[in-house]
Amino acid sequence: MKSIIFIIVFTIHLGLLAQNEYSCAEMHLKGKVKSIAETTQYAYPPQKLATMKMQSPIPTLYSFNQRGDLTEKIIGADIKYVYQYDRYQHYLSGGKKYVYSEKIKADIMFIRVKDGAFWEELTFYKKMTEKLRIDYLSPVHCKISHTIGGKVIDEKEIYYQKPYSYSKIDYILRDGKKEVYTYNDQGEVTTIIFYDENGEVTNSYGYEYVYDAQGNWVEKKQTFQTPIPDKYPEIVRREITYYD
């Protein structure tokens, strides 16, 4: 009997979404993708399962226009992001609305220079403002800052193998610690190795993928070299539809 049993659960992330969200190309999708239904399950040990209530999977649905832009992201029955875009010169700008139970909870504006300078996203809530800013210091180096209500939540530096590309991260520095990424031929991360301030390995994550005929992954399995308290490996599955 397997020592680990899988149960499907869903985690909602309401914070700012990463800069690789706005198009098929930035999400490494191949072909003319129309929509993605994505669910996540976790590998819980039996002792954890014994104290948990079973939950049904809640998919995250992504919709794209024929140009490849993300137009909607729907999480379960209550959460929806609606995207609008403007393109001019070397910029991509626009906005999206965070809708919860059919009520607009936040307006979000973003602007990005395609090949340099900065990328920024501002989320306006009723009581606070959330800001994510990326400053490109060179074609292979940038700094990222994340603030909520003027308070710094996270700061890190990223070094790339390719100029201005989020598909080939070399390593991330945060608070003196280092994360090193390696990739497969499809551009998906296969390992993340974590180092402490002294350069010693503290843990590593591994990822395995199953691909469809178009070359897009439809299953991603995560493993941990060392177990992490209250954190469990993920299995993410996708159902992808394409434009004719």
PLM feature spans:
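Bacterial Sec-dependent N-terminal signal peptides
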Residues: 1-21
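Buried hydrophobic residues that stabilize the cores of well-folded domains
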Residues: 19-244
